[in-house]
Amino acid sequence: RNHIMGELLEQKGVRVFNSSSVTRIANNKGITYEFLKDVVPFLAVKYGNEIIESKIENKGFEYPYVIKSCSGHGGSQVFLVNNSKEEEQAVKAMNGQEYVVQQCCSDLGRDVRVYIIGNKIIKAVLRTSTESFKSNYSLGGKVQEYTLNNEEKAMVERIVDKLPLDYAGIDFTFNNGKAVFNEIEDAVGARMLYQVSDIDIVEMYIK
């Protein structure tokens, strides 16, 4: 997840998986949203002093909303903020790190991860939680196989057309029942994929 190291290797003619461009973009949520703002819908995000808006309604920042580290993974440093006190605590927990503020989706505790190899959809997995607004498998979320509809497939295809992916996960949350882009997981973990399928992701990746 070090794009500088990736760039150095690429300059020496070494093929890097994922490319340094993917590593730079996918490992900073603010940069990801800016890069994809004209590609897929997502809930409005404030990054730095700018509000990044995509083609979706409800662009305000009334409570509740989410504060999350730009570089966090696995659901770490993601906070649901319901009032000014919780906002203060969340910002303090960032300890000076870059973060984004995002309008909260309506369908909490539910998201989909789409596994990508070589720009192709391998499998989609639905994650749910009744205990937390975060549905990460590592945090106790339940998983099951998920079938993407045509609109969701089209969003994935637009993303990989804009940002080719060797191996990654694309995550979507749900707002009023519709999938909206959440983030790209560079060098994505595959534990939950093994729970819902017999796919050997390592073998596919090597091929």
Regions found by a protein language model. Name each.
Residues 66, 173-174:
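Conserved protein-kinase catalytic-loop segment immediately C-terminal to the catalytic Asp
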Residues 76-163:
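Phosphate-binding site of ATP-dependent enzymes
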Residues 33-38, 61, 84-85, 118-119, ...:
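Short, hinge-like loop/turn segments at secondary-structure boundaries
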Residues 65, 100, 122-123, 168, ...:
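Protein kinase-like catalytic core scaffold
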Residues 1-47:
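Conserved N-proximal alpha/beta basic substrate-recognition cap immediately N-terminal to
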Residues 42-65:
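Rossmann-like NAD(P)H-binding beta-loop-alpha module
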Residues 62-84:
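Conserved anion/nucleotide-ligand pocket segment
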Residues 161, 165, 174-207:
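C-terminal active-site "lid" helix and adjoining low-complexity regulatory extension at the edge
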